[in-house]
From Swiss-Prot:
Protein's UniProt name: Sulfite reductase [NADPH] flavoprotein alpha-component
Organism of provenance: Zymomonas mobilis subsp. mobilis (strain ATCC 31821 / ZM4 / CP4)
Catalytic activity field: hydrogen sulfide + 3 NADP(+) + 3 H2O = sulfite + 3 NADPH + 4 H(+)
Domain annotation Flavodoxin-like: ranges: 68-206
Binding-site residues for FAD, renumbered to this chain: 328, 362, 392-395, 410-412, 416, 425-428, 606
Subunit description: Alpha(8)-beta(8). The alpha component is a flavoprotein, the beta component is a hemoprotein.
Enzyme nomenclature, EC number: 1.8.1.2
Length: 606
């Protein structure tokens, strides 16, 4: 800017300038960029209502800037948050960006992309998140085009406690390269404490693209600043700033002789204004069991009074372990590090065998590893092994149309024994055992736009949810009841025993009597010699299920275990489509994929 320009008076009276500052306070980089383009378009006489580009003077022949496509493939919202932050970074660098959920992406046109930046999580046994399944299948099919004119970079999220850590990111990265794409940067695989890695990757990507891609003007940025991606949340409460709520009900809903301990949890949100929809999850921040902490400290020869630094704060070790570190779930890196620090021969043998290491980490809690292997560590050494505490997510089991300022959960309490020592899950035992009624807990809503009731209240729905997977379908039924929805509803539920494990039995029976629940099919796996599961019940009703899908336009929903149940249900549905629709295996699989793309087959599996 020249000196003369810098001395030019601001062409706004103080009152108008104050109004402008008021309007723009608190806006994101993306929103400010859009407003900038909108106003520039107004000044040029362009039609800004459709975010069209202002007409350039005839003497100017600007080069059309490259559009950078960011694909967000998120399961719990973390990948989407990173993608949104990356979008804002690139917009601030005056680059043209299109951020889109992978589930909304027209992937058959992928070969037209110049730059793809993908942020993806991983679910189940190394599988892509639900919204990216159709895209994943397309990329790995014979239909996938060459990407010889496309550059890419991938940021993969995962959890090191699982064998196939960040596998989806690995797969996408490898496939982009196999199709001829140019890798801009090495793939990043990030664990649950991903924040620093994500920030570094975003910075590296932005700096690289600033040099590689011509910048766009404000109006061109505005044309892509508003893009078809669901923002994570507009609530003041989130993972980093949770709501302090109150536990109002903790009721066991399995029988006294059941092998399962399932709790119906009700949480009072007060007048917080926190809103959720059926299909969303509730994030619960928990604290570790003081007895577990004491056991770890005693085994390591520590008092708990030692001072350690956590996020720039100095805390007593025992307090830090209770509030800030994961103590219940082991992982392979921790086992390897503990073996190195203690030089324990048995652990050293285990870590030399990848399969043995994975099995040991998955089946041996941290405290039992310490007990079995022995060894003394300093406070700093111990916490250096541990991952930060992360919230647990639970499918919400209520509709606010029914329960208003409450949120309900269906929590399966994890309990087991190791060498005669009783162990329990960190979050589930916190809710079931350690949090008193009327006690406070920190919560937030994790929105899941990939698990929603159909917009049309007359559309039929088929709900498949064994065990605690039935939770969101309780919310679905409450919502449809309050909406006066006329669509048919069909529930498939399963558990070991009818007498002990029929969760919410009275409610389902009332919905049947009312006529809201058209059908309910029940699978009790241990009430007879031959085990019966929900997938068996699906096959028994193949003809009617096919009629609901093909003729009535039914929506299918699956919730629960990703490792076994969800795959078995997938296989059963493909068998039904193949058998009743007269298709071969490949055509049936494609039919199910089309249902996904139409949002008529949705899964919430974990």
């Amino acid at each position: 800017m020249t000196n003369e320009a810098s001395l030019t008076p601001i062409p706004l009276p103080a009152e108008k300038l104050a109004q402008l500052q008021t309007v723009t306070n608190g806006l994101s980089t993306a929103q400010i960029a859009w407003i900038s383009g909108y106003l520039w378009g107004r000044s040029s006489g362009a039609d800004t209502t459709n975010q069209s580009l202002p007409t350039s003077p005839a003497t100017e022949q600007p080069v059309e800037p490259t559009v950078i496509t960011i694909l967000s493939a998120s399961q719990t919202g973390n990948a989407r948050r990173i993608a949104e932050e990356l979008r804002d970074d690139l917009l601030a660098a005056h680059l043209k960006v299109n951020l889109i959920n992978t589930g909304d992406y027209k992937f058959k046109q992928i070969d037209r992309e110049k730059i793809i930046l993908m942020v993806t999580s991983t679910q189940g046994e190394g599988e892509p998140p639900e919204e990216a399944v159709a895209f994943y299948k397309f990329l790995f099919s014979k239909k996938a085009p060459k990407l010889t004119h496309t550059a890419f970079a991938v940021f993969g999220l995962g959890d090191i406690t699982y064998e196939h850590f960040a596998q989806a990111g690995n797969d996408f990265d490898r496939r982009f390269e196999e199709l001829g794409g140019e890798r801009l940067l090495p793939r990043v695989d990030a664990d649950v404490d991903y924040e620093e890695a994500a920030e570094a990757w975003r910075k590296e990507v932005t700096e690289l693209l600033e040099k590689r891609v011509p910048s766009a003007n404000s109006a061109q940025i505005a044309a892509t600043a508003i893009s078809p991606v669901d923002e994570v949340s507009s609530t003041p409460y989130d993972k980093e700033s949770p709501l302090t709520a109150t536990l109002s009900v903790n009721q066991k809903i399995t029988g006294r002789h059941s092998d399962k301990d399932v709790r119906h949890i009700e949480i009072d949100l007060g007048d917080s204004g926190l809103h959720y929809k059926p299909g969303d999850a509730l994030g619960v921040w928990y604290e570790n069991d003081p007895a577990l902490i004491r056991e770890c400290l005693d085994l390591l020869g520590l008092s708990g009074e030692e001072s350690i630094k956590v996020n720039d704060k100095i805390l007593p070790l025992a307090q830090a372990l209770q509030q800030s570190f994961e103590l219940t779930v082991n992982n392979t890196r921790l086992v390897e590090s503990y073996a190195t620090l203690t030089q324990n021969k048995a652990l050293e043998k285990i870590i030399s065998d990848k399969a043995a290491l994975q099995d040991y980490a998955q089946n041996t809690p941290i405290v039992d590893m310490i007990r079995q292997a022995g060894g003394k560590l300093t406070a700093e050494q111990f916490v250096s092994l541990l991952r930060p505490l992360t919230p647990r997510l639970y499918s919400i089991a209520s509709s606010q149309a029914e329960v208003e300022n409450e949120v309900h959960l269906t929590v399966g309490v994890v309990r087991y024994e190791i060498d005669g020592h009783k162990r329990a899950g960190g979050a589930s035992s916190f809710l079931a055992d350690r949090l008193a009624e009327n006690g406070n807990l920190r919560v937030f809503v994790e929105h899941n736009d990939n698990f929603r009731l159909p917009d049309n209240p007359d559309a039929p729905v088929i709900m498949i949810g064994p065990g605690t997977g039935v939770a969101p379908f309780r919310a679905f039924m409450q919502q449809r009841d309050n909406d006066g929805a006329k669509g048919k509803n069909w529930l498939f539920f399963g558990n070991p025993h009818f007498i002990e494990d029929f969760l919410y039995q009275v409610e389902w029976q009332a919905y049947v009597k009312q006529g809201l629940l058209t059908h309910i099919d029940l699978a009790w796996s241990r009430d007879q010699a031959k085990k019966v599961y929900v997938q068996d019940k699906l096959r028994e009703k193949a003809a009617e299920i096919w009629k609901w899908i093909k003729e009535d336009g039914a929506y299918l929903y699956v919730c629960g275990d990703a490792t076994h149940m969800a795959k078995d249900v997938d296989k059963a549905l493909i068998d039904i489509i193949r058998q009743e629709g007269g298709m071969d295996e490949e055509a049936a699989d494609e039919f199910l994929t089309e249902l996904r793309l139409e949002r008529r087959y949705q899964r919430d599996v974990y």
